[in-house]
C-alpha cells in the first residue's frame, strides 16, 4: 500500500496540473478504512487534518481538509495555523445547515452539532433518503410548514428521555411556549 511519504511525492509530481488538493483518507471498500473516510464519534474531530498539513508542507497550491469537522473554533485554528487553506464540512451541515452563519455571527451556542452517528449515511445508502438524528427537518429548514406556531393553550410538558429525540421534543415544546421538564 501507499504511505504518506508516497502521497507527498505524488503531490509534488502533479502540483503543476491541479488547482486544489482535497485531502481525505480511507476507503469504502474496507471497513477498517471506512472509519477514516467518515470519522465516527469514537475518533477525534479533525482526525485527518494531519494529512492535509503534511501535503501543505510540500506544495504551494491550496490544500483542503475534511473529516469529522464542525466546531467553528477548530476550523478557524486549522486555517490560522497553516494546516490547511480550506476546511470542508459535510455531515455538520446536514445537522445544522446554518452553522456557518451562526459561527460568523458569534452564535456558537446555537449550533446543533453533528453527533457523527451515521444515521445520514445509513439512510442514504439503504433507501436513498436524507435523515439526521439531530435535524428532523433535514433539507426543508426554510419551509414555512416547519415554523413553530404558538400554542392555543400553554401546557406543562414532561419529556422522558434526554437522547437526541427527547431533547428535540423538549426544545420544540419550549419554543412553542410550553413549560417543559426534561
Where does each model-flagged region fall?
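Flavin-dependent oxidoreductase catalytic cores
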Residues: 1-160, 164-180
